[in-house]
Curated annotation (Swiss-Prot):
Binding site for substrate: 8-15, 21-22, 60, 87-90, 98, 114-115, 183-184
Keyword Zinc: no
Pathway: Carbohydrate degradation; glycolysis; pyruvate from D-glyceraldehyde 3-phosphate: step 3/5
Site (Transition state stabilizer): H182
Full protein name: 2,3-bisphosphoglycerate-dependent phosphoglycerate mutase
Function: Catalyzes the interconversion of 2-phosphoglycerate and 3-phosphoglycerate.
Keywords attached to this entry: Gluconeogenesis, Glycolysis, Isomerase
Keyword Electron transport carried by entry: no
GO molecular function: phosphoglycerate mutase activity
Domain of life of the organism encoding this protein: Bacteria
Catalysis performed (reactions): (2R)-2-phosphoglycerate = (2R)-3-phosphoglycerate
Pfam family, one: His_Phos_1
């Protein structure tokens, strides 16, 4: 059976500070760096050998991928980066403290923005310091596909082509795959993989550690799902 390992990036500096991060390119905290290394150690202990790895274009996921593969003694494995694996774009909430946002907009409204499947947060202005429209890493994209805010529904619509074009074909080809990504881009793909309803996915949380493993049959039906080390 082929294996797909999802590793959410280790704790970031903004996770630690309780800030909405989204597409802001925030680094790992010291704890997050260690979580990424520990993820790789668990992979090595489990004897999982990868043929292909994918990650986003955000440094916290890229570093997690590299650190985990290094700790697993598999740093040679090919890694492809894609914006389609980026975290959900939190729009105008990006950079705001979650508690302060609740004070400003109300607990209920912020909860809806965070947890609703299809409600968008306020859009990020194009002149915002965190806007992707002026970020060189997205220069090859048509401006119309760069989001100003996303919910989980839109995140799945954005990530799904990468699943269908890259990840799923690799798995069907018998390759074990590592995906170093983000809480919500992983949740979106888990929704698709497990055929979860819009309501069911809202109760799913992806921790920074440990990695989540799916084992598939040749038709990509889930045979087994578990967290490494548990």
């Amino acid at each position: 059976m082929v294996k797909l390992v999802f590793a959410r990036h280790g704790e970031s500096e903004w996770n630690k500070a309780n800030l909405f991060t989204g597409w802001a390119d925030v680094d790992l905290s010291e704890k997050g760096t260690q979580q990424a290394i520990d993820a790789g150690k668990l992979i090595k202990e489990a004897g999982i050998e990868f043929d292909q790895a994918y990650t986003s274009v955000l440094k916290r996921a890229i570093k997690t991928t590299n650190l985990a593969l290094e700790a697993a003694d598999q740093l040679w494995v090919p890694v492809e980066k894609s914006w389609r694996l980026n975290e959900r774009h939190y729009g105008g909430l990006t950079g705001k403290n979650k508690a302060e946002a609740a004070e400003q907009f109300g607990d209920e409204q912020v909860h809806i923005w965070r947890r609703s499947y299809d409600v968008l947060p306020p859009a990020m202005p194009h002149d915002d310091e965190y806007s992707a429209h002026t970020d060189r890493r997205y220069a090859s994209l048509d401006d119309s596909v760069i989001p100003d805010a996303e919910n989980l529904k839109v995140t799945l619509e954005r990530a799904l082509p990468f699943w269908e074009d890259k990840i799923a074909p690799a798995l069907k080809d018998g390759k074990n795959v590592f995906v170093g990504a983000h809480g919500n881009s992983i949740r979106a793909l888990v929704k698709h993989i497990k055929h979860l309803s819009d309501d069911e996915i809202m109760g799913v949380e992806i921790p920074n550690f440990p990695p989540l493993v799916f084992e598939f049959d040749e038709k990509l039906n889930v045979v087994k799902e578990y967290y490494l080390g548990k």
